[in-house]
């Protein structure tokens, strides 16, 4: 029976076999003191109380009480691996970034795949966007390309992100996933139509992590050695081929093997079947951006490939599993603001918001010195700055070097060649409403030209199967949005909803307790 077990199932057995010639280590406390008895607490007599001096117990229990760190507010369930990025095509005419320096150059990478809305223990096979984040360890510091498996997103303005995520997570009173919340937000923000359509298509449930594409999604800026800049988008297409899970199979796996994606990735790498992705860019000049028919920084839209073809750049290859999940995957922290010279942000509103949000959440989750954690450390660059101290400072704290700038003592100096590309700005400063920036044209193309008839049928079935659990007035708003995309799109979904609603009558409205009313009433009763 053991011969048929996969590497993930046999991890403990393999660990023992790798150490077969070694004697077991001496068991110690966290402070390195040898332990004589790990099976029995120290008591005053066989039936007496525990003694405070049992430091073996207190050392063990105190550490156990603090094992968990805050869960990621999104992308909590994930799998990670390590490998390299190899340049196969020259793009130095676009970017001076050292990661693209010459053909054949290899850069170490770390990758984390994830679902978005589920908790850490949730299933890998739910219908949910997938995170696909890549950390490049370059000589000019880390480059974190924090992407997804879709080239688009639900919203285009970062201020909506907390509310969007709240709507996808659990109801604040029932603590249940709530279709009313999900579809109410989507129906009120029709810019979500493109991503919603992608999500409920066949690609909404990838077959594990190896068989899906990745996208930087945002628009970025590339700058070459002459200071010339272009806008770009990043794509990484799976070399294993796109594979998706049918709804029934995904449901079965969610029950029988909720860690399906994690297991599949670990076993593939352990068996030498290294997954890879071909890396591409799209490029748009500043002049083209000015005359583009829509906002080129809009995260709810794609750049047409016929106008902006994919330019091959290199390969992402994953060939090493993590040695310890917590140390190397749970503590892995991606930050879109980590950009080496040659790669810069665009005015994309969602990207601009993420530049702040990601490092901020890492400082909360992992501490202010999270970049000293080995998996996050830019180990191929020398970190030299004026940041000091803070909880969990694990290095030499930059020794006796000056901790202020400027100074007269040969401490780190700024490098003019690292200056960002300059941008001229003479515009009004205000809160611009971007809600109605053509939310349907590209969705219509997706529905009528990208999908075939069978795929359209499954898309509408998937949407109706989820939307049916929302209230009727929310269903009506959602169907109107789909009808705006294409009459056939809305009509199919409405017909399916009519069947569902005939089987199960809907309440007209839910009543929610006003905030604080229960506690207020209880307080008055006690007066």
Swiss-Prot record:
List positions binding NADP(+). Answer: 194, 201, 203, 213, 237, 303, 305-306
Q: Which cofactor does it need?
A: heme; NADP(+)
Indicate, by first and last residue, each region the UniProt record lists as having compositional bias (Basic and acidic residues): 1-22
Q: Where is this region: Disordered?
A: 1-34
Give the location in the cell: Peroxisome matrix
Q: Where is this motif: Microbody targeting signal?
A: 524-527
Q: Which InterPro entries match?
A: Catalase (IPR018028), Catalase_3 (IPR040333), Catalase_AS (IPR024708), Catalase_clade1/3 (IPR024711), Catalase_core (IPR011614), Catalase_haem_BS (IPR002226), Catalase_immune_responsive (IPR010582), Catalase_sf (IPR020835)
User: Where in this protein does the record say N6-succinyllysine is found?
Assistant: 13, 221, 306, 430, 449, 480, 522
Show the Pfam families listed in the entry.
Catalase (PF00199), Catalase-rel (PF06628)
Enumerate the UniProt keywords alphabetically. Acetylation, Heme, Hydrogen peroxide, Iron, Metal-binding, Mitogen, NADP, Oxidoreductase, Peroxidase, Peroxisome, Phosphoprotein
What positions are modified (N6-acetyllysine)? 233, 306, 430, 449, 480, 499
Gene Ontology terms, MF aspect: aminoacylase activity; catalase activity; enzyme binding; heme binding; metal ion binding; NADP binding; oxidoreductase activity, acting on peroxide as acceptor; protein homodimerization activity
PROSITE patterns linked to this entry: CATALASE_1 (PS00437), CATALASE_2 (PS00438), CATALASE_3 (PS51402)
N-acetylserine: residues bearing it: 2
**GO CC annotations on file:** catalase complex; cytosol; extracellular space; mitochondrion; peroxisomal matrix; peroxisomal membrane; peroxisome
Residues recorded with modification Phosphothreonine: 511
Q: Biological process GO annotation list?
A: aerobic respiration; cellular detoxification of hydrogen peroxide; cellular response to growth factor stimulus; cholesterol metabolic process; hemoglobin metabolic process; hydrogen peroxide catabolic process; negative regulation of apoptotic process; positive regulation of cell division
List the catalytic activities from the record: 2 H2O2 = O2 + 2 H2O
Active site annotation, chain numbering: 75, 148
Residues at which heme binds: 358
Q: How does it assemble?
A: Homotetramer. Interacts (via microbody targeting signal) with PEX5, monomeric form interacts with PEX5, leading to its translocation into peroxisomes.
Q: What does this protein do?
A: Catalyzes the degradation of hydrogen peroxide (H(2)O(2)) generated by peroxisomal oxidases to water and oxygen, thereby protecting cells from the toxic effects of hydrogen peroxide. Promotes growth of cells including T-cells, B-cells, myeloid leukemia cells, melanoma cells, mastocytoma cells and normal and transformed fibroblast cells.
The protein's name: Catalase
What species was this sequence derived from?
Answer: Mus musculus
Q: Which gene encodes it?
A: Cat
């Amino acid at each position: 029976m053991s011969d048929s077990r996969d590497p993930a199932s046999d991890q403990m057995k393999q660990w023992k076999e790798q150490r077969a010639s070694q004697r077991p280590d001496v068991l110690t406390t966290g402070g390195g003191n040898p332990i004589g008895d790990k099976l029995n607490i120290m008591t005053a007599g066989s039936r007496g109380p525990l003694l405070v001096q049992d430091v073996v117990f207190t050392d063990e229990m105190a550490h156990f009480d603090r094992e968990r760190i805050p869960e990621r507010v999104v992308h909590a369930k994930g799998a990670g691996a390590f490998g390299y990025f190899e340049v196969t095509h020259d793009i130095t005419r676009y970017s001076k970034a050292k990661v693209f320096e010459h053909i054949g150059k290899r850069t170490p990478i770390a990758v984390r795949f994830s679902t978005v809305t589920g908790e850490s223990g949730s299933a890998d096979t739910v219908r949910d966007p997938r995170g696909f984040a890549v950390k490049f360890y370059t000589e000019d510091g880390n480059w974190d390309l924090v992407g997804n498996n879709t080239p688009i997103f639900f919203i285009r303005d970062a201020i909506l992100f907390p509310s969007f995520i709240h709507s996808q997570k659990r109801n604040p009173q029932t603590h249940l996933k709530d279709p009313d919340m999900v579809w109410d937000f989507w129906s009120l923000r029709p810019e979500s139509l493109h991503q919603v359509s992608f999500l409920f298509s066949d690609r909404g449930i990838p077959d594990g992590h190896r068989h899906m594409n990745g996208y930087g999604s945002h628009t970025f800026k590339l700058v070459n050695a002459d200071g010339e800049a272009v806008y770009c988008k990043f794509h990484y297409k799976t070399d294993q081929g796109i594979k998706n899970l049918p709804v029934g199979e995904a449901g079965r796996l969610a029950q029988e093997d909720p860690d399906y994606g994690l297991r599949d990735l670990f076993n593939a790498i352990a068996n030498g079947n290294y997954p890879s992705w071909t890396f591409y860019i799209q490029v748009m000049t500043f002049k083209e951006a000015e005359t583009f028919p829509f906002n080129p920084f809009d995260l709810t839209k794609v750049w047409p490939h016929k106008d902006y073809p994919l330019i091959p750049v290199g390969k992402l290859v994953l060939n090493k599993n993590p040695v310890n999940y917590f140390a190397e995957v749970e503590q892995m922290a991606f930050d879109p603001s980590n950009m080496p010279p040659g790669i810069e942000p665009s005015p994309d509103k969602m990207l601009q918001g993420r530049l702040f949000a990601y490092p901020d959440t890492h400082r909360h989750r992992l501490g202010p010195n999270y970049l000293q954690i080995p998996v996050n450390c830019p180990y191929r660059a020398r970190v030299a700055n004026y940041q000091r101290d803070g909880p969990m400072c694990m290095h030499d704290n930059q020794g006796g070097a000056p901790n202020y700038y400027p100074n007269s003592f040969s401490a780190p100096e700024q490098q003019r060649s690292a200056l960002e590309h300059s941008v001229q700005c003479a515009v009004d400063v205000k809160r611009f409403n971007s809600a109605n920036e053509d939310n349907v044209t590209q969705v219509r193309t997706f529905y009528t030209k990208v999908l075939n008839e069978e795929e359209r049928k499954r898309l509408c079935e998937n949407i109706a199967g989820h939307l049916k659990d929302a209230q009727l007035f929310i269903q009506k708003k959602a169907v109107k949005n789909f009808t705006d995309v294409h009459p056939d799109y809305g009509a199919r979904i409405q017909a399916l909803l009519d069947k569902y609603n005939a089987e199960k009558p809907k309440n007209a409205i839910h009543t929610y307790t006003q905030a604080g009313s229960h506690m207020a009433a209880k307080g008055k009763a006690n007066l």
